[in-house]
């Protein structure tokens, strides 16, 4: 882990907190270029936009591609508060991201070892992966969110 990982993961956590405030599953992501500049950010928006594809990673990748004018993000690092799901892991492969740093593990849908490891397959792009960065903090925001969600009446799951 490089010393900047914690700094950037804190930024991703801020995006997760913004998602939680809008009733979204609190996952945040940022993409950083080789010089350490934040290129883009994303947070879950599936509920708000009624779109299953709008995960934090996908939004951050889309914004980075638009900002950089390229679909290859080969000099970039993605920071995300939770282990990517299969859809997001596929987008990471396709966008050629150089490195992925994630916070907590996803025992239900994690694609980097928690459920299966997409990275073990002979795909056309390999990249560095580091998990468990600020794991407790990243897991806590999710636990708190779902504990609060379970307290709400059944019909009001997406209301704040």
Give the residues covered by each predicted segment.
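Zinc-dependent deaminase
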Residues: 1-22, 84-160
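A short acidic/small-residue loop/turn micro-motif
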Residues: 45-48
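Short beta-strand scaffold segments in enzyme catalytic cores
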Residues: 27-36
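Short, basic and Ser/Thr-rich N-terminal targeting/leader segments
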Residues: 23-27, 74
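Helix-adjacent hinge/juxtasegments
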Residues: 50-54, 58-95
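Conserved hydrophobic/aromatic pocket- or pore-lining residues that grip, position, or stack substrates
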Residues: 12, 28, 60
